[in-house]
Amino acid sequence: MGTAPNKRVMIVAGEASGDLHGSNLVKEALRLDPTLSFFGIGGPHMRAAGVETVVDSSEMAVVGLVEVLAHFGVIYKAYATLKRLITTNPPDLLILIDYPDFNMLVAKVAKRAGVKVLYYISPQVWAWRTGRVKKIARLVDRMAVVFPFEVPFYEKAGVPVSFVGHPLADRVSPSMSRSEALAAFGLDPSRRVVGLFPGSRRGEIARLFPVILESAKLLRDRYPGIQFILPLASSLTDADIAPHLAASGLEVVVARDKVYDVMQVCDAIATVSGTVTLEIALMGVPMVIIYTVSPLTYEVGKRLIRVDHIGICNIVAGERVVPELIQDEATAERIAAEIGRYLDDPVHTEKTRAGLARVREKLGSGGCSERVAGIVLEMLGKKR
């Protein structure tokens, strides 16, 4: 009697944060069962974990309606590639990570092919387009959600769901002490440090980095000796930011890989919205969140969004723990003013840190990737 063939798993992560979470899941799944093989859409982290990437996720990381339309050709080609792979040689399981509009199209193909679907990191259906939960109920076999408030939402819709904790709770930790990090980055411990976090997508760099740098110039003028540091996302290259830095005339320390060490040396951070706000919250660093998209995207979204906040750390908290500067509010003057308040007002800063500590409590304990890997093995019919 021959041995059963190795199980094949397609995994789809369309942007930098999904690439990171997907890589940790794959590592844990392979630790539990080294015979599994993974292929799909991912970036450098997933490739390093052993995933055969048929499409690079950096090509697909765009935000907003207008931006998606501009990249339609690339996104459609990626969809066609996955559709062909699923229909010609169906995998034993499809794992989808966030990236909802694209991933739901892939889920539909998988459903027709009889492939089981695990959705890890829920689309934000609780925030906007809540009707999508009906489609999820039809196309997805299991949800692995990372926020506790998502569980009753899916249970009400009849979708099998498990709260697995948040993957960031496992990994948000500096690799050295603050004093060691300051020395490693060449920063003066006696001077203030402000983090500039312009995002992981080229579109964000083009749209938001200039105003962040303008705010930094204002801060430089108001706080002599202030220092700036920027963590460069793995999805970007020096060439993506160099022209902006050169035009600004600012001295900015650019760091790769050590993002949590970067965070811990900062007195305050100016950041784009997204997963990074949770990482900063877990590190307990005061921040100001900046969010701008095209006017059309914003007007459409304003009519659809059902939550009171843009920043996911504020959504988790259920209150505005840190300021959000949206669209026309996101000026260099406003950004500099909010950062300046952290630098000048210790009571305000401590109140913010206490709010961020509450966010950490709500994100659960570690072990997220192991719990999701257990679900993967269960759906593949394997014993742990």
Swiss-Prot record:
What EC class does the entry list?
A: transferase
Keyword Transmembrane present in the record's keywords: the answer is no
MF GO annotations: lipid-A-disaccharide synthase activity; phospholipid binding
**What does the record give as the reaction this protein catalyses?**
a lipid X + a UDP-2-N,3-O-bis[(3R)-3-hydroxyacyl]-alpha-D-glucosamine = a lipid A disaccharide + UDP + H(+)
The pathway where this protein functions is: Bacterial outer membrane biogenesis; LPS lipid A biosynthesis
Q: A Pfam family this protein belongs to?
A: LpxB
E.C. no: 2.4.1.182
The protein's UniProt keywords, in alphabetical order, are: Glycosyltransferase, Lipid A biosynthesis, Lipid biosynthesis, Lipid metabolism, Transferase
Q: What Gene Ontology terms for biological process does this UniProt record contain?
A: lipid A biosynthetic process
Task: Report the GO terms under cellular component.
Answer: membrane
User: InterPro entries, alphabetically?
Assistant: Glyco_trans_19 (IPR003835)
Q: Which residues form a coiled coil?
A: none
Tell me, in a sentence or two, what this protein's role is: Condensation of UDP-2,3-diacylglucosamine and 2,3-diacylglucosamine-1-phosphate to form lipid A disaccharide, a precursor of lipid A, a phosphorylated glycolipid that anchors the lipopolysaccharide to the outer membrane of the cell.
Q: Which HAMAP family match?
A: LpxB
Name of the molecule in the record: Lipid-A-disaccharide synthase
Organism source for this protein? Geobacter metallireducens (strain ATCC 53774 / DSM 7210 / GS-15)
Q: What is the lineage of its organism?
A: Bacteria, Pseudomonadati, Thermodesulfobacteriota, Desulfuromonadia, Geobacterales
